[in-house]
Curated annotation (Swiss-Prot):
PANTHER family: NICOTINATE-NUCLEOTIDE--DIMETHYLBENZIMIDAZOLE PHOSPHORIBOSYLTRANSFERASE. One of its GO terms (biological process) is cobalamin biosynthetic process. The gene is cobT. Pfam families: DBI_PRT. This is Nicotinate-nucleotide--dimethylbenzimidazole phosphoribosyltransferase. Catalyzes the synthesis of alpha-ribazole-5'-phosphate from nicotinate mononucleotide (NAMN) and 5,6-dimethylbenzimidazole (DMB). It comes from Pseudomonas fluorescens (strain SBW25). The lineage of its organism: Bacteria, Pseudomonadati, Pseudomonadota, Gammaproteobacteria, Pseudomonadales.
Length: 351
């Protein structure tokens, strides 16, 4: 690997803005700590953005799509063609994330990294055609090093486009039939956890289907066990193009100074990979929700993450993170617009 851009320094937190925001928070007309996690969130955003009164009005949502060779093992309840069909749904406005993006006034981009229908040419979709999906990782690496680096760069490019458009907040979403299998395999390899702890129904497998999925992942982990110590190589061995793009996007955002709102299980596994590659990126990651997929809780705990919502979600697409955006915006509004005790002429301590 010649250009190891993913190891470049992440932007430093503005300690002065953080301290000033913390001091302001303690002067607002409310008992200290009474707004709970929203207070810490506003102060965290202040330090990241370098502004005492932060804002997340400008939102960029990038959906990364790719197919998975491991689907040949029968690990998904849905056929692979759905990945390509959903690309159309994203850009025509019918998907959940499309609706949420409109409601939030977000800019939505859709990036096709490589599906089993590479002849797709959809207006509004960036088709990169890295490959016709990944290879079956039970038989060998999911992708070559060259493909993996292209996928990482695709995510970084999206972060750059977000920056150029003045984005204050970045959400990455994913679409790829079979990608919970890839995410579970990746998480197991990086966390050295039992496969059954991190593997769930995905798009709707029954108990027998989940057991089969566990067995498939165990075969893959045995095949690639020798390279578990290398997070990037493990990503290339067991991940998906869209997961690698998420890793690249998260690292790119941290290096450029854009706050990331992380979505569900698959995105959180991508965040785990990113923190293993470049630990300093962790400060730039805010976690939107804890989803229904059983492995999500384990990965969040390992990242010491406190997700904002828990609604039993398991859709993906960036939808759970998008649902948390109003909380971030309201946390900023409360922090920026509430009066201080001095401004409101309110006594700042009990009688």
């Amino acid at each position: 690997m010649t250009d190891t851009w993913w190891l470049n320094p992440c932007k430093a937190i503005d300690a002065q803005a953080y301290e000033q925001a913390l001091a302001r928070q303690q002067q607002l007309t409310k008992p200290a700590g009474s707004l709970g996690q929203l207070e810490a969130l506003a102060v965290q955003l202040a330090g990241l953005q370098g502004q005492v009164k932060p804002s997340v009005d400008s939102l960029w949502i990038a959906i990364f799509a790719g197919d998975h060779g491991v689907v040949a093992e029968g690990v998904s309840a849905f056929p692979q063609e759905v990945t390509g069909q959903m690309l159309q749904n994203f850009v025509t406005g019918g998907a959940a994330i499309s609706v949420l993006a409109r409601q939030l006034g977000a800019q939505l981009e859709v990036v096709d990294l490589g599906t089993v229908t590479p002849s797709l040419d959809l207006p509004g979709v960036r088709h990169l055609n890295i490959g016709a999906g990944t290879a079956n990782f039970v038989n060998g690496p999911a992708m070559t090093e060259a493909q993996g680096q292209l996928a990482l760069q695709a995510g970084r490019d999206s972060a750059w486009r977000a920056l150029a458009n003045g984005a204050q907040l970045f959400i990455g979403g994913e679409m790829g039939i079979g990608n919970t299998t890839a995410a579970s395999a990746l998480a197991c390899a990086l966390l050295d956890c039992p496969v059954s702890d991190l593997t769930g129904p995905g798009t709707g497998l029954n108990a027998q289907g989940v057991s089969h999925k566990v067995a498939v992942i165990e075969r893959a982990l045995a095949l690639h066990a020798g390279q578990r110590g290398n997070a990037l190589q493990t990503l290339f061995n067991l991940g998906g193009f869209e997961i690698a793009a998420l890793v690249g996007a998260y690292l790119g955002c941290a290096q450029e100074g854009i706050v990331v709102l992380v979505d569900g299980f698959i995105c959180t596994v991508a965040a785990l990979v990113a923190t293993r590659v470049n630990p300093a990126c962790r400060e730039w990651l805010v976690f939107g929700h804890r989803g229904a997929e059983p492995g999500h809780r384990h990965v969040l705990q390992r990242l010491d993450a406190q997700p904002l919502l828990e609604l039993g979600l398991r859709l993906g697409e960036g939808s759970g993170a998008a649902l948390a955006v109003p909380l971030l915006r309201l946390a900023c509004a409360l922090h920026g617009q509430m009066a201080t005790f001095a401004e409101a002429a309110v006594a700042d301590r009990p009688a």
